[in-house]
């Protein structure tokens, strides 16, 4: 899980979603998981 100021899609499987006001990236590749903070 990366904590980044700006979250970006790293591949075509990445999806940017919003959970409880937190922007997150979910992906089939666990290395691509990110959250904004």
Swiss-Prot record:
It comes from the Bacteria. One of its GO terms (biological process) is translation. GO terms for molecular function: structural constituent of ribosome. This is Large ribosomal subunit protein bL36. It holds the Pfam family Ribosomal_L36. Keywords: Ribonucleoprotein, Ribosomal protein. HAMAP family: Ribosomal_bL36. NCBIfam families: rpmJ_bact. One of its GO terms (cellular component) is cytoplasm. Belongs to the bacterial ribosomal protein bL36 family. InterPro entries: Ribosomal_bL36 (IPR000473), Ribosomal_bL36_sp (IPR035977). It comes from Methylibium petroleiphilum (strain ATCC BAA-1232 / LMG 22953 / PM1).
């Amino acid at each position: 899980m990366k904590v980044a100021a700006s979250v970006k899609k790293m591949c075509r499987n990445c999806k940017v979603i919003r959970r409880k006001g937190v922007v997150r990236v979910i992906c089939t590749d666990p290395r691509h998981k990110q959250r904004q903070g």
